Amino acid sequence: MNQMNPAFVMPDVQSTVDTRQIPIQRVGVKAVRHPLTVCTESGDVQPTVGVWNLDVRLPADQKGTHMSRFVALLEENRAPLTVERFRAMLASMLVKLEAEAGRIEVTFPYFVNKTAPVSGVQSLLDYEVTLAGESRNGDTRLFLKVLVPVTSLCPCSKKISQYGAHNQRSHVTIDAELAADLPVEALIRIAEEEASCELWGLLKRPDEKFVTERAYENPKFVEDLVRDVAQRLDADERVVAYVLEAENFESIHNHSAYALIERDKRQAA
């Protein structure tokens, strides 16, 4: 049986000098699946699974980073995730990896319990959420991204048809840079309230009637959808910049309709 010599010192290859003198902007681990709990707007804790990307900047004279420390960081941070804890986690990563710059990103399914508009039956609806943070030269920026499924109904189709109008499921994606803590539910509400109609996981027949008529009374082009959501984001002081996308999965075409608005309020000030 092999026994390690107690006097033997295991070499740290990653910390040796690299003679090529080429810095690496981002190096780390990608697509790490790890259990995660997140705090909801109501103060409850929701269990989910996060897919993590963690990386740091590597100086030109350092051969490699310490990959195991990224995973160790996840193991050490099991408390329910909030924006402030995420910020602290980013700072801790830079200390652990002895790095001047770094980025953390986690994507996870987030569930909201919704009540049907007429019958009142409750059901869960899932949303894709990404929380990201980057730190460079002492400056930390935090981003919250939410993909919200909604319904859109075509104003042109309604106008030219004797009855009915084509409608479809759409995705509104809001990627917001945060100035202050902003609940996931707040971004979801903005997207759903500005769509032709929101979605529910479970609907009874009276609910289906409501959804159909609500969308018909509130038609919107993809251009209308992004502009209306953009107005809401412009008015929210918790958001300093955003990239906003809308994609309509057209029911009468084999392609999507798409629109994007990008704005940094700091440049407009």
UniProtKB/Swiss-Prot annotation:
It is an enzyme of class 3 (hydrolase). Transmembrane segments: none annotated. It catalyses: GTP + H2O = 7,8-dihydroneopterin 3'-triphosphate + formate + H(+). The record marks C154 as: May be catalytically important. GO terms for molecular function: GTP cyclohydrolase I activity. Pathway: Cofactor biosynthesis; 7,8-dihydroneopterin triphosphate biosynthesis; 7,8-dihydroneopterin triphosphate from GTP: step 1/1. Its EC number is 3.5.4.16. GO terms for biological process: tetrahydrofolate biosynthetic process. Keywords: Hydrolase. Pfam families: GCHY-1. Belongs to the GTP cyclohydrolase IV family. Converts GTP to 7,8-dihydroneopterin triphosphate. This is GTP cyclohydrolase FolE2 1. It comes from Burkholderia cenocepacia (strain HI2424). The lineage of its organism: Bacteria, Pseudomonadati, Pseudomonadota, Betaproteobacteria, Burkholderiales. The gene is folE2-1.
